[in-house]
């Protein structure tokens, strides 16, 4: 079986968020299952020179973008057994940032068209094209409407994964003819029209053979008005073609037994060494090195989506508890200012680093006792799984992937691997923090919790098997349709 991942970013080449981690890890796991999984992404200016040196040009062609004829170079690179194709066009991709440009609609209209135009040139005929988020949303739509009548494309199926429904790729109506070679027939509610705009995300939801999202709970949530971002009706209509498959983490990169960023490596059998990381973390943030004071951590984008309004609301009440807090992140100015001010107001209790620093993030995952993640919504979330892998117990709100990966501790049955609350309410969160702190002071309970957390499987292996089954059923369904239809 051959699968092409069409993505706008992919680790380790270009990354702005969790999508890059998925695109970097999942194809590797699929190859271990015998699938010829390859990845196609733009050749961004920001890709490190050491990667660019390893690329070799395998094709050149002209791609139509409305009335324009744009150059397209295809460069190939092999890394960890996976073949990567980079779409080269300096006009569109020689920019300092991946996204946020005035012509993102044109840039990704070009990329979607290039994905399909390039395949015959590189002589790769995938059984499935797996697209991710709005940037590649027009690939399934263009394939269905403009390419499937051609023999080369006739058997190709499409899968579209929603990583975050909030970002939809909305552009003015004129983009249809000007960039997509589509006429006014397609500006209707059953095609691309979305509240007066053209929606790349909707194009994928309408035309893909299968839609997946990144956790079973998020799959259910997005079919409701509260989480559905005005697409819940369409998603309910397509519920038979909708799957929720939980993301994994790269358990080789996030491995407390061999993590080069840690002060002290440790395993489930040597959990006492975790304390050395806690002391190092306290030292790094100028906090007193107290072993018996619980240290709560947050590694987060500082946005409202991450539930930081709850934290700001009850922060002073949190500080009345015997605890320390460490925060690493960047984002909205108001949250950056708030946490910086709180670090000054509570010296010895609060440590804050504004920005992102990979080695420090690993040290936090290893050194903290508890990890706070009170998200408003969370399609999957990776941080809670990383925390569990390092034996750091999560406190989460029951939404999306947080609900699927963290089971609240039950003192009667002794089951669970963390603590959770249901309502998006600051005092519900505060109650749950206090509950977690009470069990921290019961060593026998805490030992059980940390051992259970570290023994869990958070890898991509389980998820890759589910994707493989989904691809196989999709191909089988199509063969059945051809025979009996």
From Swiss-Prot:
It comes from Geobacillus thermodenitrificans (strain NG80-2). It is an enzyme of class 2 (transferase). GO terms for biological process: glycogen biosynthetic process. InterPro entries: Glyco_trans_1, GS/SS, Starch_synth_cat_dom. Coiled coil: none annotated. One of its GO terms (molecular function) is alpha-1,4-glucan glucosyltransferase (ADP-glucose donor) activity. It comes from the Bacteria. This is Glycogen synthase. Pathway: Glycan biosynthesis; glycogen biosynthesis. Its EC number is 2.4.1.21. Belongs to the glycosyltransferase 1 family. Bacterial/plant glycogen synthase subfamily.
């Amino acid at each position: 079986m051959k699968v092409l991942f069409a993505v706008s970013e992919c680790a380790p080449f270009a990354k702005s968020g969790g999508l890059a981690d998925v695109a970097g890890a999942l194809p590797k796991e699929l190859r271990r299952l015998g699938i010829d999984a390859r990845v196609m992404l733009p050749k961004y200016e920001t890709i490190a020179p050491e990667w660019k040196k390893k690329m070799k040009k395998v094709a050149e062609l002209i791609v139509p973008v409305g009335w324009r004829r744009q150059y397209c170079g295809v460069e190939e690179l092999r890394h960890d057994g996976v073949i990567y194709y980079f779409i080269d066009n300096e006009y569109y991709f020689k920019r300092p940032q991946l996204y946020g440009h005035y012509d993102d609609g044109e840039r990704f209209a070009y990329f979607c068209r290039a994905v399909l135009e390039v395949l015959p040139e590189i002589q790769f005929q995938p059984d499935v094209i797996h697209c991710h988020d709005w940037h590649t949303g027009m690939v399934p739509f263009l394939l269905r409407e403009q390419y499937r009548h051609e023999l080369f494309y006739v058997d190709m199926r499409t899968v579209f994964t929603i990583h975050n429904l909030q970002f939809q790729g909305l552009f003015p109506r004129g983009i249809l003819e000007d960039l997509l070679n589509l006429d006014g027939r397609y500006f209707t509610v059953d095609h691309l029209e979305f509240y007066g705009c053209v929606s790349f995300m909707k194009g994928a939801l309408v035309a893909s053979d299968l839609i997946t999202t990144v956790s079973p709970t998020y799959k259910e949530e997005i079919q409701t008005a509260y989480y559905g971002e005005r697409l819940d009706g369409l998603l309910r209509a397509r519920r038979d073609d909708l799957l929720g498959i939980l993301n994994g983490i790269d358990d080789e990169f996030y491995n407390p037994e061999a993590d080069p960023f840690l002060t002290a490596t440790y395993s489930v059998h040597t959990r006492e060494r975790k304390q050395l990381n806690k002391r190092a973390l306290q030292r790094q943030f100028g906090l007193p090195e107290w072993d018996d004071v619980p240290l709560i951590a947050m590694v987060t984008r500082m946005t409202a989506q991450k539930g930081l309004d709850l934290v700001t609301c009850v922060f002073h009440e949190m500080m009345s508890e015997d605890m320390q807090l460490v925060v690493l992140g960047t984002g909205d100015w108001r949250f950056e200012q708030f946490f910086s001010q709180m670090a000054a107001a509570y010296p010895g209790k609060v440590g804050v680093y504004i920005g992102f620093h990979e080695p420090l993030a690993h040290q936090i995952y290893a050194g903290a006792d508890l990890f706070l993640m009170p998200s408003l919504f969370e399609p999957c979330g990776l941080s809670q799984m990383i925390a569990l892998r390092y034996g750091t117990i999560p406190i989460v709100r029951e939404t999306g992937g947080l609900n699927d990966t963290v089971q609240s501790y039950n003192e009667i049955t002794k089951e669970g691997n963390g603590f959770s609350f249901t309502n998006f309410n600051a005092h519900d969160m505060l109650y749950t923090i206090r509950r977690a702190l009470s069990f921290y002071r019961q060593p026998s309970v805490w030992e059980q919790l940390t051992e259970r957390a570290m023994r869990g499987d958070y890898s991509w292996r389980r998820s890759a098997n589910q994707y493989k089954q989904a691809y196989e059923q999709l191909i089988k369904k199509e063969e059945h349709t051809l025979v009996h239809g």
